[in-house]
């Protein structure tokens, strides 16, 4: 949690601090964005449908057209490889964050852009969140869902106000969204928290929705290592070990 807290100290203010796009990269017809970097979560596999692969490339090109740099999981295989190459080939900066232990498995050939090797998954997620102004999930598996749900939860808790989007290719995320809707109807997720999740079937439509997103919660929650030292003992006296 300490590493995630360090990331979110920057992330809470990051959207405002990095809203202005940087110069460089892209072409003369580039559509500017309020986002400097978008973090993309996606699978290290390509999936069984060509539409998933096409969507990864489409998303990469959309980021390039809008002058947005990419933050991602650092792999060169699967959808990660496709989206990172599309952004890099288009002249935008790519930041890949990957645990050292995963490099032999997920990096083949020459990696693109800037590769940051970290100690483990917690540091990876914290670094990706720190660099990003928004988050997009392409189709993926357990790892993609874990990363996605963490930033959704952080938004619900008011730790950050960065938009979170699903690129819902061929209805891939329909079952997930149905589960969220059921959790709302059963009283486990608040209706305003449901609106944290933005989805669209195409990259262009999704990025437009992210641009228009208005946060549901105010940033303000802090982790225990950010609290004043004088307050921490009062908390500790209420905690018992099992």
Curated annotation (Swiss-Prot):
Task: List localization entries.
Answer: Cytoplasm
> Which organism's genome codes for this protein?
Oryza sativa subsp. japonica (Rice)
> Which residues does the annotated region (Disordered) include?
9-30
Please tell me whether the keyword Hydrolase is annotated for this protein: yes
Kind of enzyme, top EC level?
hydrolase
- GO cellular component terms, semicolon-separated: cytosol; nucleus
Q: Which family does it belong to?
A: Belongs to the LOG family.
Task: Please name the Pfam families in this protein's record.
Answer: Lysine_decarbox
Organ and tissue specificity: Expressed in roots, leaves, stems, tiller buds, immature inflorescences and flowers. Expressed in the upper part of shoot meristems, including axillary meristems, meristems of developing panicle and floral meristems.
The superkingdom of the source organism is Eukaryota
Q: Which residues form the signal peptide?
A: none
Q: What is its EC number?
A: 3.2.2.n1
Name the PANTHER family on file. Answer: LOG FAMILY PROTEIN YJL055W (PTHR31223:SF70)
By what name is this protein known? Cytokinin riboside 5'-monophosphate phosphoribohydrolase LOG
State the remark under miscellaneous. Answer: The name lonely guy came from the fact that flowers of the mutants often contained only one stamen but no pistil.
